[in-house]
């Protein structure tokens, strides 16, 4: 029995790809989708959250026996 391709039903007809030359490469593709006012979004981001991988806190929890 030959397996059928179920993925064909999920996509519309026509090419499901984009030529890399159309957008100027991979970086160009990403930058084309960002409006000019959103390109500096990370410049105003404040890193006020605790360290998610705080090794000292993990070692302290293991020695205290508390979780």
From Swiss-Prot:
One Pfam family this sequence matches: MYEOV2
Source superkingdom: Eukaryota
Cited InterPro entries: CSN9_metazoa
Keywords (A to Z) from UniProt: Signalosome
A single GO cellular-component term on record: cytoplasm
Disordered: annotated span: 1-31
GO biological process: cellular response to UV; positive regulation of cell population proliferation
Known role: Component of the COP9 signalosome complex (CSN), a complex involved in various cellular and developmental processes. The CSN complex is an essential regulator of the ubiquitin (Ubl) conjugation pathway by mediating the deneddylation of the cullin subunits of SCF-type E3 ligase complexes, leading to decrease the Ubl ligase activity.
Oligomeric and partner information: Probable component of the COP9 signalosome (CSN) complex.
Similarity comment: Belongs to the CSN9 family.
Protein name: COP9 signalosome complex subunit 9 homolog
